[in-house]
Amino acid sequence: MIFDVLTLFPEMFECVLSHSILKRAVEKSKLKVNLINIRDFSKDKHKRVDDYPYGGGPGMVMMPQPLFDAIEFVKSQGNIPVYYLSPKGKIFTQEMARELSKMERIALLCGHYEGIDERVYAVIDGEISIGDFILTGGELAAMVVIDAVTRLIDGVLSHPQSALEESFSDYLLEYPQYTRPEVFRGMRVPEVLLSGNHAEIARWRRQKSLEITLLKRPDLLKKANLTEEDKKFLREKGYEI
């Protein structure tokens, strides 16, 4: 998969792409990230990309010319959708990550300052928000999207089942995880996980996943694909279905 990232700070991505799963994805040729410096498209002799807002107000606004030219440069290479990272966008979810992972190539536009000139919306295809809070720029949000999407691409994770069992994969939060030692400061690993009975382990994990979701994110249960056994378990916990 190819990501075209339009940004004023391409160097910010060098670290995240040089470690862990993203690094391995690049090495396996499962991921390619083209870092495109918006400033390179500015026609201003000082390479300015921002100016004061019409009507007054605090801060600066990213100018349309460099953004239009940068986006048109990307779109000239094919039918590539451009998504603007913005707090006004559609909330990024695991479901959205899954849909994006099926695409061959997408572009992410990272805003800065007080945002972009409104006319730039004419050449973008959508907006993505990673939550109801404000960041200095879209770079961190773009990194979140790239990471979440990349781990869903076939062949990226060493154990594909990991992606299926993680939180939000089926609108349920993940079950508790344990590793060695068996006892730490008086706290023991649940006996069922040591039993070797895979059916009982799977049942325990499913019930713990349901229990944790009910406790921390009950809103997700309305979207989850629940079995009759799941529903019975939740009713016993006081959840009305």
UniProtKB/Swiss-Prot annotation:
<keyword id="KW-0963">Cytoplasm</keyword>
<dbReference type="InterPro" id="IPR029028">
    <property type="entry name" value="Alpha/beta_knot_MTases"/>
</dbReference>
<keyword id="KW-0808">Transferase</keyword>
<dbReference type="Pfam" id="PF01746">
    <property type="entry name" value="tRNA_m1G_MT"/>
</dbReference>
<dbReference type="GO" id="GO:0002939">
    <property type="term" value="P:tRNA N1-guanine methylation"/>
</dbReference>
<dbReference type="GO" id="GO:0005829">
    <property type="term" value="C:cytosol"/>
</dbReference>
<comment type="similarity">
    <text>Belongs to the RNA methyltransferase TrmD family.</text>
</comment>
<comment type="subunit">
    <text>Homodimer.</text>
</comment>
<keyword id="KW-0819">tRNA processing</keyword>
<dbReference type="GO" id="GO:0052906">
    <property type="term" value="F:tRNA (guanine(37)-N1)-methyltransferase activity"/>
</dbReference>
<keyword id="KW-0949">S-adenosyl-L-methionine</keyword>
<protein>
    <recommendedName>
        <fullName>tRNA (guanine-N(1)-)-methyltransferase</fullName>
        <ecNumber>2.1.1.228</ecNumber>
    </recommendedName>
</protein>
<comment type="function">
    <text>Specifically methylates guanosine-37 in various tRNAs.</text>
</comment>
<dbReference type="InterPro" id="IPR016009">
    <property type="entry name" value="tRNA_MeTrfase_TRMD/TRM10"/>
</dbReference>
<dbReference type="InterPro" id="IPR023148">
    <property type="entry name" value="tRNA_m1G_MeTrfase_C_sf"/>
</dbReference>
<dbReference type="InterPro" id="IPR002649">
    <property type="entry name" value="tRNA_m1G_MeTrfase_TrmD"/>
</dbReference>
<keyword id="KW-0489">Methyltransferase</keyword>
<feature type="binding site">
    <location>
        <position position="111"/>
    </location>
    <ligand>
        <name>S-adenosyl-L-methionine</name>
    </ligand>
</feature>
<dbReference type="InterPro" id="IPR029026">
    <property type="entry name" value="tRNA_m1G_MTases_N"/>
</dbReference>
<feature type="binding site">
    <location>
        <begin position="130"/>
        <end position="135"/>
    </location>
    <ligand>
        <name>S-adenosyl-L-methionine</name>
    </ligand>
</feature>
